[in-house]
């Protein structure tokens, strides 16, 4: 025995020495490995963030791009070469022709010479003949003389003879006489013959001379031509040679460049190959090291196993009993039965040390030992039999756990071999689930690494399952992906079963561990850091170290204690480890649930965060299973290999964990002593460090990174202390590789598997870095895509595809990980993310990742957990939270994006030199966003005034809260997201600025052309409109081509650039707003219900918001597509298809209703749905307006392209008028009309802007100037002429835009009315136009009475314009457009006042007559002393407006065709076009569209305001009519009309519905007097105030009034002159119907507008009533006097609130009389539509009470207000003009807008727009600089006083203003200032608010 013992001890000592040697080698290898890892890390750090592959790819991509560029250049050169060759051929052909011609000429010359010689010969012969004849004649004469002499002699001799017999003499005498007679006759005949012959010869001689001279001349010319052709041939030959030389040089250069690129590419390829070879060498070295390390670890494990076996033999009987028990344990027994030793060492080890098995099993279950797994697996390969205990091989019996495990592919050979064993399956499953998080990533690579080794091992050791192992090793990733894809549900069930089995095994192991004493704290500590670390990261090294620590701590602590102590500690820790694991798992499940409920988006966003959460959840089997199952296939594939590797490592670790427990007592003690020496402080340090790790883990939920760092440090300490660092490092590296695999889940798994199969940790690290670098490159690509979104689409598409791929991968991982949580949110987000420009996905994901990090931190924070944990929030707000969080993520992003977009807009406007206007408009937009919510709520609430005030307060508070919250939330997220957002925004700004510049250049070029045309037109003012139309059409066709090209490119670029920005802005703003909502308790409380509503609405309208591009593209695309036609529709269809593909569910659910209700939703849902949404979600309200703002910036581009394409739109709209009429009628007559009209209004306004900017601006303005000047002399005739010229454009624009708009609503009416209006217009242009409006108004029924009120003449003309009742509604619409245009014009005028705005106005409408505007502005600036100049300034301002409107009218080229029928109509259309033109030339299309978008959104809630806006235009028309009647109002109107308009508008809200008529009349009368005084001051002294107030005949009034009326000037002059036509127009509604029916009869419409304006003195109430009440009684003077507001406005309020107004408007649009009668005349309806569409800005502004702010600001600075209101008015005006254009009332609407611009001058927004746009633009442009300086300064004071009142009143009585607009119209009868009052109170408040905003 002693000898045996000594021999055994000797063997043991030998083994110990060998073990020490191996450990030393392992340590050295570990150190070398660490050094190599550090070296690799340094090399990678040197390489930079991006790997050489990324750089090489970038360089290769750049080189490819360059090659493509060179190739394109080469192709271009070839094309040029071909062209040159063709040119040369053509030149040669011409030369040949010249040669032939030369030859012909030479031949002809020869022939001519021969003919000349022949002629000469003939001439000589004839001369000789003549000489001969002369000689013969002389001879005959001589003979005759001789004969006569002879006869005479005979006769003389006869008497001498004896008388002959009487009979003889008589006979002789007759004979002689006969002879003489015969001879004489013969002689005479001969003479005649000779004379004839001589004459013939002379004539032939003359002819011959002529032919000779011709031949000589022809010969000379031929010679000259020959010489010239020779010179041309020489020059062409020289050019050909030069071109050939150039071509050759280019070819040489290109070849050289190509060679260079080829060389560079080859060099890069060589470098790439060299790097690959280096990497391969490094990988080989690392692999060798890994193999060596693994072999060493296997040997160590083998010795440990032997030692444990010896220890188990030498153990006490108690241990033997335990061993017997453990060995005989039926659960443990199966582990050993069916598994050969070769196949599974773990089974052998438990057999060898059954006593230690109970504890090791649970210990292995919970203690991750990847390194030991590997080592043990290799031990399996190298140790055929480690124990003497025979393990009978048992055929593998299929076991459900085994099947499950195989389904998940968790264990490879281990599972397969031990699968039949239920206990092993159980142990394996929990180990896989528990270790899975830890080894998930490393497992992925271990699966890759081990499969190679394990396959060989399996083949050698596991003959039963070599193929299976090989499969696992070779195609683990593919199997995982395929199996997971195929059996995803089965895997889920299996995962759940595994979780159950794991729990069971943990329970059993816990019981066993409880049986033996446990150092639970240490194990818990070790387990805690283990699990927490696994929860912490994606398989970071800390996790690996923790696994090693757990093993080592357990093993070492066990070593410190006796083997029993080891067993107890191991078993106890197992139980308690299981307990904390369970608790952690439960916590993880709860956190997952909270994450699922509360952070669906967040989980989707961060791939890293997702992986972290995945690891965290994977630690807990249940949570792991849930999120694991939810994880994408890729992550699951990675997880499966990790599971397999984890199981293998787990089983190996079990074995090894059993080994230290099974050491013989002595050797065990020795080892324990060694371990104690090494790790005396380790048990404590593990506990302390585990506790520390647990603590940071708890904190780590909120601060994962910091904790990971702390943990990493702790783990490093433990690793340093632990002797098995070498094993840990492999595990850590494996984990890192697994992490890299998980991180690179998005990348091809095959690559990861290939690297994973390589056991080299270097490769793993490199793969991690490479994956990270790939991800970073992808992110960089995403960022670059975001930045380069605005770059050429081809490049964007390439990057977008890359981004989409990356995003799809990331989104798939993020979405799959929270699929359960965020399947809905993930799908919607993913679809949204995958929306047309997948680049948004990247940005969204980046933003969402940032948000997810923050939200995860916040969610992980107890507060977030508590929040999410709240059952009410979970139950009630799960879906709400999802939506809310989406909204939070989106709304704050929107608010945040709004800011950058606003900055973009500001920069764009700054580029336009409209920074102050942009800032003011942004401020006003901010207030609009807040107060637009007010009009929305205001519509919702019955007490519109009180609720509007309350909503103002609440929304202001909420807006401020949202702003604060958005600031607080946006600040961090902006810091995070602005990285991605700002570059796109900056580039978007650049692109937008560039596009704007291009569009401005286009518009300028078009404007220059228009100026040239307009100059010629000015010279030809009275020429036929057909010539003007032809020119405009030619210019329009050119502009259409240019605008189509630039518009398409701009649309594409802007859509691509802004679509993603809009989406991202909307999403980011919504997310920010959502976070603001969460942060805002008020918002949370109010919005919980509102969120429910908002969620529902989000289901309905959120698509609009969630898919801002989708609905907007749908709506805007409908607008643009209908205007642009198929092009925009194709782009929209592509966007829709992309959005549908990405958001099939959303679009199927949302886009379909959006498509069907798109138009309605854009108006009604934007009004109704967005009202609750805005009311419910203030953040979204704030976001929506910013969304409108981004669309504004987009709108700038869109406006540019729309402006460019507006001509195209006009033509398309003209063609689409019929279709549009059908479509609008097919659609809800009201909503469709409103929506489509609104859309068309926007398009028309944009096109009007474009037209104003391009063609009509200069042409119409010049025409208008001419007309205005002509009007100064003869108001009506010049009005007719100017109306014709302007109306041509206005009609053109109205045909295109208003044509569509009216075509939809008024197409038929316009045709009928236009027919009448044309007939009337041709006979009485003014009266016709006014009758068209009168038709509207009379149809409203109110126009006739207001006509009576307006003036007897107006009444007379209203008789003719009884048809103009409809036109009044059209004028209302036009008034709205005019108000908007007035705002725009006001802004433009203010811009004129403001050099920046003026510059912008120049940039946009420079051709609009900027010069005249400047001159007239200078005149207007000159002051009252220069009243005629101010009138001229108004004229030029009007002309500016007509410029703008001219451009719009150019779009309204058809308007010019109508202008032939009546210049008055053209004037009205010019007014309309001025308003529209002010809309069209809105230099702030971005803001304008933003305002339009924001106001359009707001407009939806403000149909009443739309009506008030319509009344304002009516007032404007009335004001124009009144200015005719009241020259002062126009004069004072221009300088003071704006200010007093503000005052009046402000005061008008005070008047209320009924108060306004009387009070406003009195007040307006007082103001008229004050305006008369102010005008006296403002106007030249020579101009009597009465002239401005009343006298249309007064030249200064005509100048000021006409000029100011020029947009309205025609209407104004018509108002002066046509004041009667307005009355006639009232009586002539059929004409307006006719005019309305004839979309192109805008001149008659404009004339009707003029008539309506004339009638608007009372007709303004009509139009206001038409718009507001849409009830003729309201329009009637009685209604106005009584506060016709009550009827019309009450009806209009009801209809506006209920959408009846829209219906009535549409119906009215269909029939002018119905418009009035149905609650809104066609103008009213269109005004509503315009208001809804364009007025929504004004309307929403008015409703928002932004007017108050705007009025206050305007009160302080009226020109600034005008600028601001012009900005917003331009937006609103553009919308109005668009709506007017869309209404088909643009002519009328333009007139109305012209009048409303005057009224808008009265109205802060509309009034200013009117001042600026209608008269005030002239005022502002000319008189705003002059009169506005005088009058507006006074008006500013007044506006300040009244503006504040009106602001409050507008807030309270914006609706009232809208309601009071008709009433205000009655004051409008008092004078232009009264319409100003009315306009201020009602629409002008809106316009001002929108304008100021």
Swiss-Prot record:
Position(s), cross-link Glycyl lysine isopeptide (Lys-Gly) (interchain with G-Cter in SUMO1): 1136
Region forming the signal peptide: none
Assigned keywords, A-Z: Acetylation, Coiled coil, Developmental protein, Intermediate filament, Isopeptide bond, Neurogenesis, Phosphoprotein, Ubl conjugation
Residues in cross-link Glycyl lysine isopeptide (Lys-Gly) (interchain with G-Cter in SUMO2): 1136
Annotated Gene Ontology cellular component terms: cytoplasm; intermediate filament
InterPro entries: IF_conserved, IF_rod_dom, Nestin
PTM sites of type Phosphothreonine: 316, 389
Annotated region (Linker 12), positions in chain: 152-174
Region (Head): 1-7
Renumbered residue ranges of the record's region Linker 1: 44-55
Gene Ontology molecular function: CCR5 chemokine receptor binding; intermediate filament binding
Ranges annotated as biased composition (Acidic residues): 1458-1469, 1561-1576, 1688-1709, 1773-1788
Segments for region (Coil 2A): 175-193
Basic and acidic residues composition-biased segments: 572-595, 606-615, 634-646, 670-681, 717-730, 761-774, 802-818, 846-879, 949-966, 989-1051, 1198-1212, 1241-1253, 1354-1363, 1393-1403
One record GO biological process: G2/M transition of mitotic cell cycle
Location of region: Tail: 315-1893
Family assignment from sequence similarity: Belongs to the intermediate filament family.
Function: Required for brain and eye development. Promotes the disassembly of phosphorylated vimentin intermediate filaments (IF) during mitosis and may play a role in the trafficking and distribution of IF proteins and other cellular factors to daughter cells during progenitor cell division. Required for survival, renewal and mitogen-stimulated proliferation of neural progenitor cells.
Protein name from the UniProt record: Nestin
Gene name for this UniProt entry: Nes
């Amino acid at each position: 025995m002693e000898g045996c013992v000594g021999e055994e001890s000797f063997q043991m000592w030998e083994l110990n020495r060998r073990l020490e040697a191996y450990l030393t080698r392992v340590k050295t290898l570990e150190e070398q490995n660490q050094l190599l890892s550090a070296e690799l890390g340094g090399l990678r750090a040197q390489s930079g963030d991006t790997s050489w592959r990324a750089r090489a790819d970038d360089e290769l991509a750049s080189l490819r791009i360059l090659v493509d560029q060179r190739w394109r250049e080469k192709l271009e050169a070839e094309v040029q070469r071909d062209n040159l060759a063709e040119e040369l051929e053509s030149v040669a052909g011409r030369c040949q022709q010249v040669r032939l011609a030369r030859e012909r000429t030479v031949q002809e010359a020869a022939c001519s010479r021969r003919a000349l010689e022949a002629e000469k010969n003939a001439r000589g012969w004839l001369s000789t003949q003549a000489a001969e004849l002369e000689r013969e004649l002389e001879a005959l004469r001589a003979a005759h003389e001789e004969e006569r002499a002879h006869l005479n002699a005979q006769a003389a001799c006869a008497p001498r003879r004896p008388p002959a017999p009487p009979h003889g003499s008589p006979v002789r005498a007759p004979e002689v006489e006969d002879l003489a007679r015969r001879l004489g006759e013969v002689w005479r005949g001969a003479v005649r013959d000779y004379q004839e012959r001589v004459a013939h010869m002379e004539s032939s001689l003359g002819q011959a001379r002529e032919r000779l001279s011709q031949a000589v001349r022809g010969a000379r010319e031929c010679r000259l031509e020959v010489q010239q052709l020779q010179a041309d041939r020489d020059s062409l030959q020289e050019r050909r040679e030069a071109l050939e030389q150039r071509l050759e040089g280019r070819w040489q250069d290109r070849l050289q460049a190509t060679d260079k690129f080829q060389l560079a590419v080859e060099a890069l390829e060589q470098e790439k190959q060299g790097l690959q070879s280096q990497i391969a060498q490094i990988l080989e070295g690392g692999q060798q090291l890994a193999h060596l390390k693994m072999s060493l670890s296997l040997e160590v494990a083998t010795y440990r196993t032997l030692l444990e076996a010896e220890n188990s033999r030498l153990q006490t009987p108690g241990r033997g009993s335990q061993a017997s028990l453990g060995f005989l344990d039926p659960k443990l027994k199966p582990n050993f039965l069916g598994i050969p030793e070769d196949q599974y060492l773990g089974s052998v080890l438990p057999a060898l040390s059954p006593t230690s098995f109970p504890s090791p099993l649970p210990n292995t279950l919970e203690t991750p030992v990847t390194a030991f797994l590997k080592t043990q697996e290799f031990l399996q390969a190298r140790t055929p039999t480690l124990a003497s205990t025979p393990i009978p091989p048992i055929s593998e019996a299929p076991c459900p756990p085994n099947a499950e495990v195989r389904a998940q592919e968790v264990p490879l050979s281990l599972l397969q071999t031990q699968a039949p064993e239920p206990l092993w399956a159980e142990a394996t499953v929990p180990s896989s689930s528990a270790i899975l998080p830890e080894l998930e990533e490393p497992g992925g690579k271990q699966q890759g690494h081990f499969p190679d080794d394990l396959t060989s091992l399996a083949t050698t050791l596991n003959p039963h399952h070599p193929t299976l192992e090989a499969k696992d090793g070779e195609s683990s990733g593919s199997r995982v992906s395929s199996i997971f894809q195929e059996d995803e549900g089965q895997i889920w069930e299996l995962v759940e079963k595994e979780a159950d089995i794991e729990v069971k095994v943990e329970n059993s192991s816990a019981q066993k561990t409880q049986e033996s004493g446990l150092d639970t704290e240490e194990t818990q500590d070790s387990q805690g850091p283990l699990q927490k670390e696994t929860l912490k990261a994606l398989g970071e090294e800390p996790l690996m170290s923790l696994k090693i620590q757990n093993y080592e701590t357990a093993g070492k602590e066990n070593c410190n204690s006796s083997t029993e102590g080891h067993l107890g500690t191991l078993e106890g820790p197992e139980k308690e480890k299981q307990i904390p694991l369970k608790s952690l798992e439960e916590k993880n499940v709860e956190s997952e649930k909270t994450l699922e409920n509360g952070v669906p988006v967040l989980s989707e966003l961060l791939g890293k965060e997702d992986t972290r959460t995945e690891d965290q959840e994977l630690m807990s089997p249940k949570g792991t299973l849930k999120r694991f199952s939810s994880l994408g296939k890729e992550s699951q594939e990675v997880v499966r290999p990790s599971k397999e590797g984890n199981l293998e490592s787990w089983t190996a670790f079990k074995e090894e964990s059993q080994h230290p427990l099974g050491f013989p007592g002595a050797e065990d003690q020795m080892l324990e002593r060694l371990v104690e020496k090494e790790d005396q402080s380790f048990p404590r340090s593990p506990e302390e460090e585990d506790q520390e790790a647990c603590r940071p883990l708890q904190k780590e939920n909120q601060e994962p990174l910091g904790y990971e760092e702390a943990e990493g440090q702790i783990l490093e300490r433990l690793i340093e202390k632990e002797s098995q660092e070498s094993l840990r490092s492999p595990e850590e590296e494996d984990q890192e590789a697994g992490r890299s695999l998980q991180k690179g889940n998005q990348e091809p798994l095959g690559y990861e598997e290939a690297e994973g199969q390589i056991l080299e940790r270097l490769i793993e690290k490199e793969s991690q870095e490479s994956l990270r670098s790939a991800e970073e490159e992808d992110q960089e690509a995403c960022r670059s895509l975001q930045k380069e979104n605005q770059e050429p689409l081809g490049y964007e598409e390439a990057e977008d595809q890359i981004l989409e791929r990356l995003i799809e991968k990331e989104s798939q991982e993020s979405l799959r990980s929270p699929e359960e949580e965020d399947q809905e949110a993930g799908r919607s987000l993913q679809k949204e993310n995958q929306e047309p420009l997948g680049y948004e996905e990247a940005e969204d994901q980046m933003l969402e990742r940032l948000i997810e990090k923050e939200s995860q931190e916040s969610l992980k924070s107890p507060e977030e957990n508590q929040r999410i944990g709240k059952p009410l929030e979970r139950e009630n707000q799960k879906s709400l939270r999802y939506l809310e969080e989406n909204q939070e993520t989106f709304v704050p992003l929107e608010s945040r994006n709004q800011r950058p977009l606003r900055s973009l807009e500001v920069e764009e406007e700054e580029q336009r030199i409209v920074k102050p206007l942009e800032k003011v408009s942004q401020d006003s937009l901010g207030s609009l966003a807040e107060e637009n919510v007010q009009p929305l709520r205001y519509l919702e609430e019955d007490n519109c005034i009180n609720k509007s005030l309350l909503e103002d307060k609440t929304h202001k508070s909420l807006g401020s809260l949202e702003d604060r919250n958005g600031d607080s939330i946006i600040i961090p997220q902006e810091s995070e997201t602005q990285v991605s957002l700002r570059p796109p925004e900056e580039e978007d700004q650049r692109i937008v600025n560039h596009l704007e510049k291009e569009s401005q250049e286009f518009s300028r070029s078009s404007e220059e052309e228009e100026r040239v045309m307009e100059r010629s037109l000015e010279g030809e003012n009275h020429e036929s409109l057909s010539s003007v139309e032809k020119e405009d059409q030619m210019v329009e066709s050119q502009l259409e081509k240019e605008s189509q090209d630039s518009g398409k490119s701009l649309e594409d670029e802007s859509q691509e650039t802004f679509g993603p920005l809009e989406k991202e802005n909307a999403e980011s703003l919504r997310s920010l707003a959502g976070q603001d909502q969460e942060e805002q308790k008020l918002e949370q409380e109010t919005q919980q219900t509102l969120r429910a509503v908002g969620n529902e609405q989000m289901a309905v309208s959120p698509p609009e918001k969630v898919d801002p591009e989708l609905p907007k593209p749908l709506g805007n695309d409908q607008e643009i597509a209908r205007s642009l036609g198929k092009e925009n529709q194709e782009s929209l269809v592509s966007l829709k298809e992309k959005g549908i593909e990405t958001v099939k569910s959303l679009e199927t659910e949302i886009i379909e209703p959006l498509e069907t209700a798109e138009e309605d939703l854009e108006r009604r849902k934007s009004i109704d749905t967005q009202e609750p949404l805005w009311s419910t979600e203030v953040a979204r309200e704030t976001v929506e307006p910013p969304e409108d703002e981004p669309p504004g910036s987009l709108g700038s581009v869109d406006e540019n392209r729309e402006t460019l394409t507006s001509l195209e739109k006009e033509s398309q709209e003209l063609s689409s008028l019929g279709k549009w009429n059908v479509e609008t009628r097919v659609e809800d007559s009201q909503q469709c009309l409103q929506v489509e009209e609104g859309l068309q209004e926007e398009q028309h306004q944009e096109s009007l802007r474009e037209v104003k900017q391009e063609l009509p601006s200069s042409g119409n303005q010049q025409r208008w100037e001419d007309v205005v000047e002509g009007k100064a002399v003869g108001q009506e005739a010049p009005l007719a002429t100017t109306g014709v010229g302007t109306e041509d454009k206005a009609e053109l624009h109205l045909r295109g835009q208003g044509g569509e708009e009216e075509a939809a609503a008024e197409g038929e009416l316009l045709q009928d009315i236009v027919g009448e209006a044309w007939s009337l217009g041709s006979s009485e242009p003014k009266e016709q136009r006014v009758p068209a409006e009168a038709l509207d108004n009379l149809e409203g029924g109110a126009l006739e009475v207001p006509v009576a009120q307006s003036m007897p003449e107006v009444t007379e003309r209203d008789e003719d314009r009884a048809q103009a009742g409809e036109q009044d509604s059209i004028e209302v619409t036009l008034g709205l457009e005019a108000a908007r245009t007035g705002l725009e014009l006001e802004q433009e005028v203010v811009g004129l006042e403001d050099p920046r705005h003026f510059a912008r106005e120049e940039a946009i409408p420079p051709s609009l007559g900027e010069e005249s505007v400047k001159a007239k502005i200078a005149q207007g600036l000159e002051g009252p002393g220069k009243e005629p100049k101010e009138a001229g300034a108004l004229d030029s301002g009007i002309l500016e407006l007509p410029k703008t409107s001219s451009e719009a009218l150019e779009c309204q080229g058809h308007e010019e065709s109508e202008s032939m029928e009546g210049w008055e109509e053209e004037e009205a259309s010019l007014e309309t076009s001025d308003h529209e033109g002010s809309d069209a030339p809105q230099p702030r299309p971005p803001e304008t569209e933003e305002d339009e978008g924001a106001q359009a959104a707001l407009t939806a809630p403000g149909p009443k305001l739309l009506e008030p806006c319509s009344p304002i235009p009516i007032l404007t028309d009335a004001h124009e009519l009144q200015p005719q009647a009241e020259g002062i109002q126009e004069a004072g109107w221009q300088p003071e009309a704006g200010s007093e308009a503000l005052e009046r508008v402000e005061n008008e809200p005070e008047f209320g519905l009924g108060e306004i008529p009387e009070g406003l009349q009195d007040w307006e009368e007082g103001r008229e007097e004050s305006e008369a005084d102010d005008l006296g001051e403002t106007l030249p002294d020579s101009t009597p105030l009465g002239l401005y107030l009343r006298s249309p005949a007064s030249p200064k009034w005509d100048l000021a009034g006409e000029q100011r009326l020029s947009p309205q000037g025609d209407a104004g002059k018509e108002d002066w002159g046509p004041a009667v036509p307005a009355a006639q127009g009232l009586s002539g509604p059929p004409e307006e119907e006719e005019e309305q029916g004839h979309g192109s009869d805008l001149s008659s419409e404009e004339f009707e507008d003029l008539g309506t304006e004339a009638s608007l003195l009372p007709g303004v109430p009509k139009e206001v009533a038409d718009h507001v009440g849409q009830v003729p009684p309201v329009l009637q003077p009685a209604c106005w006097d009584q506060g016709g507001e009550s009827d019309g406005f009450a009806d209009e309020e009801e209809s506006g609130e209920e959408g009846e107004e829209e219906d009535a408007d549409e119906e009215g649009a269909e029939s002018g009389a119905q418009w009035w009668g149905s609650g809104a005349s066609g103008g009213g309806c269109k005004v509503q539509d315009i208001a809804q569409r364009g007025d929504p800005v004004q309307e929403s502004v008015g409703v928002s009470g932004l007017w108050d702010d705007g009025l206050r600001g305007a009160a302080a600075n009226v020109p600034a207000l005008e600028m601001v209101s012009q900005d917003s008015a331009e937006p609103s005006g553009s919308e109005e003009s668009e709506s007017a254009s869309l209404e088909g009332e643009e002519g009328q609407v333009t007139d109305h807008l012209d009048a409303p611009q005057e009224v808008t001058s009265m109205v802060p927004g509309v009034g200013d727009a009117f001042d600026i746009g209608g008269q005030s633009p002239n005022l502002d442009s000319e008189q705003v600089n002059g009169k506005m300086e005088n009058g507006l300064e006074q008006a500013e004071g007044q506006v300040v006083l009244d503006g504040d009142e009106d602001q409050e009143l507008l807030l309270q009585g914006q609706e009232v203003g809208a309601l009071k607009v008709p009433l205000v119209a009655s004051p409008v009868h008092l004078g232009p200032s009264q319409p100003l009052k009315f306009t201020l109170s009602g629409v002008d408040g809106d316009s001002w608010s929108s304008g100021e905003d």
